[in-house]
Amino acid sequence: MIKLVRVDHRLLHGQVIFAWTKSEDIERIIIIDDKTSTDDFKKMSLKLTKPEDVKLNVFSTNKAISLIPRIKELTDNIMILFSNVKEMSKFVTAYGDIKEVNYGGVPNRDGAKQYSEAVFLTPEEVEESQNLKAKGVMLYIQQVPSRRKEILNEKI
């Protein structure tokens, strides 16, 4: 069962490892990231970083989409992590049954507009996000579980 879908350019780091995995009782983390899926060193580093009792899978976006039927059958409490909005939007659209997406960290870049202290979106990312919003997906910004959710749907 998917407990959390999060966009965070840092992928697996302290906030995710200590705060989110505990608050959501996460048993499996699925990282969907095209670059990471082909980087053996980064995959090994992520496996060493994750909590010992949590399973970890790393897939490209297309591979993850091909595995959607199997992901839907998993009984673990799952967190899905993306490093960027584009890959998240592609997967969430294909999955079809994701109600919420947490925007945890999207870095500042040329042409990006600031939506919170840690979330900056380009016009293309705003458009991707608006498409998800139009499909009924609630998008929110929240760094850690103890902080208040900021509803991104109201800002885009």
Regions from the PLM with identified roles:
Residues 1-55:
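Long, hydrophobic N-terminal alpha-helical segment
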Residues 2-5, 27-30, 55-57, 77-80, ...:
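Structural motif
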Residues 8-12, 60, 121:
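A general structural motif
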Residues 33-36, 61-63, 85, 105-108, ...:
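Short, ordered loop/turn segments at secondary-structure junctions
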Residues 46, 88-92, 129-130:
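Short amphipathic alpha-helical segments and helix-helix/interface helices
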Residues 47-49, 75, 119:
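Short, hinge-like loop/turn segments at secondary-structure boundaries
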Residues 59-104:
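Ordered, amphipathic secondary-structure segments that act as subunit-interaction surfaces
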Residues 94, 99-156:
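Glycine-rich, aromatic-bearing surface loops/beta-hairpins
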